[in-house]
Amino acid sequence: MRVLVALSGGVDSSTAAALLVAEGHDVIGVSMRVADYSDARRGRSCCAPDDLEDARAAARRLDIPFYVANVEARFRERVIEPFVRDYVEGRTPNPCVACNSDVKFDWLLARARALGAKLATGHYARVERRGGRFALCRAGDPAKDQTYFLYGLGQEALRDVLFPVGDLAKRDVRAVAAQAGLPNAEKAESQEICFVTQGDAGDFVALRAPGSVRAGEIVSTAGEVLGRHDGVHRFTVGQRRGLGLAGPAPRYVVRLEPGTARVVVGSAGEASRDRFAVTEVRWIAGAPPPRPVAARVKVRHRHEGEEGTVTPDGGGGQVRLARPVRGVAPGQAAVFYDGDEVLGGGRIV
C-alpha cells in the first residue's frame, strides 16, 4: 500500500512513518511549510524551520522520499486570518482544528489520493469500522488523545486516513523511534501555536492587526470599573490569571465586548454556563441525527467533558450540560462524544 505520511518533524509522525516502513508499505514523507520563518526563533512548536530539517533527517534515516509542500497561501487564508479576526472580535479560536480540517486533511489528503495513496499522520486517534461506517475513536492512551482537534473529519476522509500511533502510549512511541534509529526519538513535544514564533498569541494579533486593537476597561458584571487593559484579544472567557486585579475573591473573565473594548469579570459562577449554541457543526456520520442526542461534551482540549444533550438545528445546534462549566469560550470547539467515539463538534457561539 502506498502511504503519504505528514511529517511534522516530531517523534510521533516520524514513528508513524517508521511503523509503516516496517510493515512493508510504500511510504512517502511530506512536510508543510505554512509560513515564512526567515526571522523565527527555535521554539517548541511544529512546522518551524528546524522541524522541517528534523523531518528531512527522519525521512533520510528511513530511506523514504521526502518533499516539502508550500501551503503558505492556503494556511494564511484558512488558519491565520480567521485566527486574528476571531481574537479581535472577542472570540478564542482553535487554529489546530482549522488546520486539520482545512489543510492537513483537505489539501494533503487530495494530494495523497492523486498519488493513489492513503494519508497517515502522527495523531493520537483511532479509526474503526462500526456498522458499515467509519468511526473516529479516542486514542489508546487517554492522556495523549487528540480527537478533540479532529472532529471535522467526515466519512470520506476517515476512509483514507491512517493513525499508526493511535494505539500506543508516548513511551512506546519513543521506544519504537529509538529502535528505528530516528534522530528525533527524544525530541520535546510541541507546545506552542506553530505560526506564533515570537511572543504570544496576543503579540501576534497586535502585530497583524494593529489598527483593530484598542485599550479599554476591565469592569465587573455590575459595571464597576476595576482596571484597564490593552486589548480584548489578550483575554479569553474563563480566564483568571493575568487580569492584574487585586481583591479578596478570585475574578474570572465572564465575557468580552469588542465593540466597547470592555473585559467583563465576575465570580466563577458568573463565568460558567450550562447552555450554549454551536455553529458550523460537523457530524462524523455525515448527516445530523434526527433527534437530540446524549453526549459527553468537551469545551476545550484538556477538559474532561461534561454530560449533556445536543439538539441539532440546521447547520448548528443547542447544547445543554448537566452542570455549569467554567470557561465556555466563544470561538472554541465543543466536541461531542459517545463513549470513546466522536459524534461531531462545532464552534461555540
UniProtKB/Swiss-Prot annotation:
GO molecular function: ATP binding; tRNA binding; tRNA-uridine 2-sulfurtransferase activity
Reactions catalysed according to its record: S-sulfanyl-L-cysteinyl-[protein] + uridine(34) in tRNA + AH2 + ATP = 2-thiouridine(34) in tRNA + L-cysteinyl-[protein] + A + AMP + diphosphate + H(+)
Known function: Catalyzes the 2-thiolation of uridine at the wobble position (U34) of tRNA, leading to the formation of s(2)U34.
UniProt GO BP: tRNA wobble position uridine thiolation
The protein's Enzyme Commission number: 2.8.1.13
Keywords assigned: ATP-binding, Cytoplasm, Disulfide bond, Nucleotide-binding, RNA-binding, Transferase, tRNA processing, tRNA-binding
PANTHER family membership: MITOCHONDRIAL TRNA-SPECIFIC 2-THIOURIDYLASE 1, TRNA 5-METHYLAMINOMETHYL-2-THIOURIDYLATE -METHYLTRANSFERASE
Localization, UniProt: Cytoplasm
Site (Interaction with tRNA): 123, 332
InterPro entries referenced in this protein's UniProt entry, alphabetically: MnmA-like, MnmA-like_C, MnmA-like_central, MnmA-like_central_sf, Rossmann-like_a/b/a_fold
Active site: 99, 194
GO cellular component, one term: cytoplasm
Enzyme category, top tier: transferase
Disulfide bond positions: 99-194
Region Disordered: start-end pairs: 300-320
Family to which this protein belongs: Belongs to the MnmA/TRMU family.
Pfam family, one: tRNA_Me_trans
Protein's UniProt name: tRNA-specific 2-thiouridylase MnmA
Residues binding ATP, per UniProt: 6-13, 32, 122
NCBIfam families from the UniProt entry: PRK00143.1, trmU
